C-alpha cells in the first residue's frame, strides 16, 4: 500500500478555506481509478450531517475509488474514518485503501473486521 501525499494536500486544501471549528472540521480526498482526486468537507449537525468522506465519495460520482484520506482541522493531520464511514466505504468502495494516522494504510476490510456487507442482505 502506498502513502499518497497529494491526497493529504488536497484534503487540507478543501478544508482550509471553510474550516470554522464548529460545523466544518474534517476534509477528505479520494483518488479514483482514473487518477483524479475528489474532495469533500463534513457538515456537522446534531441530526447527523454528512462526514467529509461521504461528501468526497458523492463528488466522485460513481468513479471506482482506490484510496481515501481524511484530515482534521486545527493541525490535527490525518484522522481515522468513523464507524459509519467505514461501513459506507466497505459497501460502496470495497477494497479501498484507507490512509491512517502515523503514515500507515489499510484496506477498509481490515478496519471493519467481520463487518456486515449490505450486498448480502439481512
What are these regions (language model features)?
Residues 51-69:
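Short, charged low-complexity linear segments at domain edges
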